[in-house]
């Protein structure tokens, strides 16, 4: 870890290198990563519906990994979850996780839209990736985790994972 680097910055850098090593930045497309993003976010919604804490934490981390990869593909060298600040005042109401997940799905739709349009609006797409990560931060906060906790857990899960890239999407061995 570099001297002034936060723990989450360190793990974001490791995730970017992991993606480079597997040719997911240059050898994949934002469209392919968007499919992976939808998959991981769907797992998060499933975890919340089932109230499965382990799946929720894993899915937050996995979704962050894909967001970091997409931001790198789109050329955002400055993307960092450390830049997120969200309002925690309205988070003490019952069933708020479901409301937050639905709001995040709106951001997911916006990301999909900006990835799919002919003249990509990269800045708006990155803005929606940040907004989705902010949603993840809110859900993590409700479960008493930080985004860094979720990212570190996800990285430790994937760092030595074997697999292959199929049509620009990382498929772990055994899937």
Describe the role of every protein-language-model region.
Residues 1-175:
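Flexible "arm" and connector segments at domain edges
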